[in-house]
Amino acid sequence: MIGNDIVDLVLAKKESNWKRNRFLDKIFTIKEQVLIVDAENPEIMVWNLWSRKEAAYKIYNRETGIRGYFPLQLECFYENATLGTVSIKGKTYFTQSKIENDSICTIAVVEKEYFKKIKSINPAVKILKKNGIPFTIDCNSKMENPVSISHLGGFCE
């Protein structure tokens, strides 16, 4: 299983006031809020953690069929700016984030070794959806392959 998320930092800066009253309380646990406050760049930390939660949520939704908005139940465990885990209800997902000047991209997987198996999809490949969850069909085996798609602002992955 895989999940991914992209945050357009330019768009986030323009459209999301993460410093507004109670914003952090609604989305981040106390431990995560400490990471944000103590960070060299708190704004980047906010969107890094948010991206990790979103990527992990995509796997959780795919595994359980549960849809909803419950960011406080998704808890980030931060190793460093690029690696960590996200846990929810006894499930743990591994995350890998890439921070660039104008974006943060996070990929989440259920097993660390799956990071090595991730491939980009040719834009010409037809992506199908079942219950809102995207997949492709392998031409040879006819097996369904799970995919994860993110697009926000000027980015698509």
Give the positions of each predicted feature.
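Core catalytic alpha/beta fold that binds nucleotide/phospho-ligands
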Residues: 1-157
